[in-house]
């Protein structure tokens, strides 16, 4: 049977429990028509690149499906009817990816970075202070400003 990756986006105001119920409902439709879901990943509430149906965020869910094309037509029909689903996309693939998807690997990598703690120094490296702030950076205090010589000559030429 053909293999599919199916991603759907649920509304931002839907709770996590409602999203899980949607997922089990879709899984039930797939299994009822002779297909099977090999993997389910909930990517959580994520920001959208642009607004869709007045939503700035959405719950993302990935389903790896092994089933006939009738399964895909039926779940897409069900999702068109359902108001909680903002968007969906089904792609036929040659084989399913083993292990976590790229989105889950990215989330794991971000979590590992958070464990490192706050970074010291930022992008300026070890350049202590800044020149336009108190302390003057490496230059230190420059002392009082010395008078300009050309200021005296400019005033004399105007007279």
Swiss-Prot record:
Key words, A-Z: Ribonucleoprotein, Ribosomal protein, RNA-binding, rRNA-binding
Bias (Basic and acidic residues) ranges: 93-151
Stretches the record annotates as Disordered: 93-159
Gene Ontology annotations for the cellular component aspect, listed alphabetically: cytosolic small ribosomal subunit
GO biological process: translation
Pfam families: Ribosomal_S6
Gene Ontology MF: a single term: small ribosomal subunit rRNA binding
InterPro entries for this protein: Ribosomal_bS6, Ribosomal_bS6_sf, Ribosomal_S6_plastid/chlpt, Transl_elong_EF1B/ribsomal_bS6
Keyword set includes Ribonucleoprotein: yes
Coiled coil: none
Keyword Thylakoid in record: no
Function: Binds together with bS18 to 16S ribosomal RNA.
Assigned protein family: Belongs to the bacterial ribosomal protein bS6 family.
HAMAP family named in the record: Ribosomal_bS6
Protein name as annotated: Small ribosomal subunit protein bS6
Taxonomic source organism: Rhodopseudomonas palustris (strain HaA2)
Lineage: Bacteria, Pseudomonadati, Pseudomonadota, Alphaproteobacteria, Hyphomicrobiales
């Amino acid at each position: 049977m053909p293999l599919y990756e199916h991603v759907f986006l649920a509304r931002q105001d839907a709770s996590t429990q409602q999203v899980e119920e949607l997922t089990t409902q879709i899984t039930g439709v797939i299994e009822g028509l002779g297909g099977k879901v090999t993997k389910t990943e909930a990517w959580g509430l994520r920001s959208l690149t642009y607004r869709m149906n007045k939503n700035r965020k959405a719950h993302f869910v990935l389903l790896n499906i092994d089933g006939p094309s009738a399964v895909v037509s039926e779940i897409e029909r069900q999702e068109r009817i359902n108001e909680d689903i903002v968007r969906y996309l089904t792609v036929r693939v040659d084989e399913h990816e083993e292990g976590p998807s790229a989105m889950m690997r990215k989330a794991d990598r971000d979590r590992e970075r958070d464990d490192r703690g706050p970074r010291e120094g930022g992008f300026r490296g070890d350049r202590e202070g800044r020149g336009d702030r108190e302390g003057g950076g490496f230059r230190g205090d420059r002392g009082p400003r010395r008078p300009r010589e050309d200021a005296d000559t400019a005033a004399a030429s105007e007279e």
